[in-house]
Amino acid sequence: MLLTDLPDGARATVRLVAAASPEIGPGLLRRLGELGFLPGEPLQLLRRGPGGREPLAVLIGETLFALRRLEAQCIDVEPL
């Protein structure tokens, strides 16, 4: 399941970070890894932006990230 498919407030574990479209380059995937989006890492999708759109507020540990939909679609998760 993609991070974008999780309901607001749901917790999950990162399974895989991979390019979801040709627009995604290796630099973005590397950056997501540097931010902590790594396999096995627990996270929580807190909420979406206005109208259920961007950005997605994602909590990893004690750090809150605001991700664009394109970035969030690169993160495959296992719901808890």
List the predicted regions and their residue ranges.
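Compact, glycine-rich, soluble single-domain proteins
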Residues: 1-80
